[in-house]
Amino acid sequence: MNRLSTKLVVAIGIGSALYGILGLWGFSIAPNTFIKPALAILTVFGALFGPVAGLLIGLIGHTVTDTIAGWSIWWGWVISSGIIGFTMGFIQKRVGFSVKNGTYNKGDISYLAITGLIGIVIAIIFAGAFDIIVMGEPFDKIVIQVLGATIADVIVFLVLGLPITIGLAKSNKKHTHLKIEK
């Protein structure tokens, strides 16, 4: 069985705290649905530390947000944050990709974009279905929430998460195009 390294546990703790606290702020776009810039944390930490870290940061961080805000914990949405973090972490498993070393190519960026978008859609549909089936929420309300949350998460992912992750990788590149003249 693989054990979590100290570094990974610390990263999960920091990522969860950041995601949990930053998740308290957002812009309302539908009933109980917000554009939350905190989603970028799942992209960055998933790309840096992998799917397990992304999953745990999403689960723990969203639980922290709901607890601090005083809302009851909406487990379908907590799990959806975990799913999003998990799928954002797939990129870290690609050979040749490393935010830490600044190694990536256009295919890696496309892969992150596609897996991120698919993960968001799957996660939000899961949360909506969970709310209808388990929580007994009205279908009409959930359709609005699912559409709003999907649009909001896609915007944050494309405008913040993806560019920040690419920017971090670029800043960590080990080589430049500068040449030493003799």
From Swiss-Prot:
Coiled coil: none annotated. It is a multi-pass membrane protein. It is found in: Cell membrane. GO terms for cellular component: plasma membrane. The keyword Transmembrane helix applies. Keywords: Cell membrane, Membrane, Transmembrane, Transmembrane helix. The chain crosses the membrane at residues 9-29, 40-60, 71-91, 114-134, 142-162. Pfam families: ECF-ribofla_trS. Gene3D superfamilies: 1.10.1760.20. InterPro entries: ECF_substrate-spec-like, UPF0397. NCBIfam families: PRK13661.1. PANTHER family: UPF0397 PROTEIN BC_2624-RELATED, UPF0397 PROTEIN SPR0429. Belongs to the UPF0397 family. This is UPF0397 protein BA_2640/GBAA_2640/BAS2460. It comes from Bacillus anthracis.
